[in-house]
Regions:
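Short beta->alpha linker loops
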Residues: 48, 74-75
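A structural signal for isolated positions on well-ordered beta-strands in alpha/beta enzyme cores
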Residues: 20, 68-69, 134
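N-terminal nucleotide-binding beta1-loop-alpha1 segment
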Residues: 2, 6-43, 58, 65
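Structural motif
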Residues: 23-27, 72-73, 136-139
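Conserved beta-loop-beta/alpha segment of the NTase-like Rossmann-fold superfamily
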Residues: 97-152
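Short alpha-helix within the catalytic core of nucleotide-sugar-dependent glycosyltransferases
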Residues: 58, 77-78, 85, 143-151
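A short, N-terminal amphipathic alpha-helix
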Residues: 49-70
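Acidic donor-binding segment of Leloir-type glycosyltransferases
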Residues: 77-101
Length: 152
């Protein structure tokens, strides 16, 4: 059953718009052990004020993508949660946005992920209702104009 707000604005369950995003942490091994012994790559600081995860989140927010699934490795994930919090800084804390977190368990030295990683991705893709999904990673430092990529 659709709520009055849903009927009024024409939104359906989780189908805010036709674009969604998967935001992931690094899968595999990177020789940055001195930097990542106690935190994932996504929460590494940059410029004294930012974290690496800020860059893909800002690209998504600037493109108006409001359905985001963040999937992260279980090890030391609390620093990512502490930094993202509600997602308010990127417009992901409103009633019309969706931000989900998935956690998978794998050894840092492994270059593969388990079945639970892909199961969570498939579930999100099926439920998102989006026509197109962009996948971004947190180990590349870049600002991308996704409006140009998707021709929004």
């Amino acid at each position: 059953m659709l709520s009055d707000t849903t009927r009024k604005w024409g939104y359906q369950k989780m189908k805010i718009d036709k674009y969604s995003a998967i935001l992931g942490n690094t899968v595999g091994f990177h020789d940055m052990s001195t930097l990542t012994n106690h935190r994932p790559v996504a929460s590494l600081p940059f410029g004294g004020k930012y974290r690496l995860i800020d860059f893909p989140l800002s690209s998504l927010a600037n493109a108006g993508i409001r359905s985001v699934f963040g999937i992260f490795q279980q090890d030391n994930i609390s620093s990512v949660f502490d930094h993202i919090r509600s997602g308010r800084e990127w417009g992901l804390s409103t009633l019309l946005s969706h931000y989900y977190l998935g956690i998978y368990n794998t050894r840092v030295e492994s270059s593969t992920v388990g079945e639970e990683y892909y199961d969570q991705l498939l579930t999100y893709l099926k439920r998102s209702g989006s026509n197109q999904t962009v996948a971004l990673n947190c180990d590349i430092l870049v600002n991308i104009d996704l409006n140009q990529v998707f021709h929004l």
